[in-house]
């Protein structure tokens, strides 16, 4: 079983690709009502994005509740460039036999503009090649630690992550323009259930996971985050992969 948590689809796509290549099943943890039984699994995998150089809280909480059978355990984190100590920290919650980081298209539109179409296609093509190798290593139960931690990994995974969780998860800067048609896509897609509709317009709870699905997947590009996101490209992986690879 391969468990995943995803925002704009990068980690979902990676999990599904690995499931296909290894003959396994990919499962979105946000759809699970109960902690699954993995005692009979031959392999247990985790795929998730890097949030401020750590695994998302929702994924670490989920993993900490899972049983730890004799299955081969692996983790893949998707990131824009560096992973910091993400996998080492995650392995404290669920010990891993193999750990990987995989560069995928940028989606943190709050911090910087998303990648161009050309860069997106290049990153996805590189990821496809890397996933072939990762799948073979998993199938052969090879113990691998191929994580690009980057510079000052410890500082980033401690101080930057602390700052992110303390200050950056606020939803106050979110707002919608008059392009909003009240479709509710943002509310349906929010894994934290932090968005609800009031008078046909989205409203946010005080904090969220900063998964960026709402702002990137809004069909009318009506959602903004302060002034920083106006005019920036939106990104979801579905627009850049074949139909058969989409959710």
Predicted regions and their residues:
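Iron-sulfur cluster-binding cysteine motifs and their immediate structural context
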Residues: 175-176, 181-203, 207-209, 213-230
């Amino acid at each position: 079983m391969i468990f995943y948590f995803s925002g704009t689809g990068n980690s979902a796509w990676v999990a599904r690709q690995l499931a296909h290549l290894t003959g396994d099943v990919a499962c979105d943890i946000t759809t699970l009502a109960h902690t699954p039984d993995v005692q009979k699994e031959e392999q247990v995998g985790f795929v998730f994005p890097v949030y401020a150089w750590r695994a998302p809280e929702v994924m670490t909480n989920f993993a900490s509740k899972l049983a730890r059978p004799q299955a081969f355990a692996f983790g893949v984190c998707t990131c824009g460039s560096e992973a910091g100590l993400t996998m080492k920290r995650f392995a404290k919650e669920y010990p891993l036999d193999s750990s990987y980081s995989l560069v995928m298209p940028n989606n943190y539109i709050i911090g910087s503009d998303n990648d161009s179409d050309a860069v997106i296609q290049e990153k996805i093509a590189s990821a496809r090649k890397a996933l072939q190798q990762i799948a073979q290593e998993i199938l052969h139960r090879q113990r691998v630690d191929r994580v690009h931690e980057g510079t000052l990994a410890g500082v980033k995974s401690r101080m930057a992550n602390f700052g992110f969780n303390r200050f950056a998860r606020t939803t106050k800067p979110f707002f919608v323009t008059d392009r909003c048609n009240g479709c509710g896509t943002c509310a349906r897609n929010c894994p934290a259930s932090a968005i609800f509709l009031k008078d046909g317009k989205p409203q946010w709870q005080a904090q969220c996971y900063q998964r960026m699905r709402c702002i990137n997947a809004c069909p009318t590009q009506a959602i903004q985050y302060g002034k920083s996101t106006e005019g920036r490209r939106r990104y979801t992986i579905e627009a850049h992969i074949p139909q058969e690879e989409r959710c």
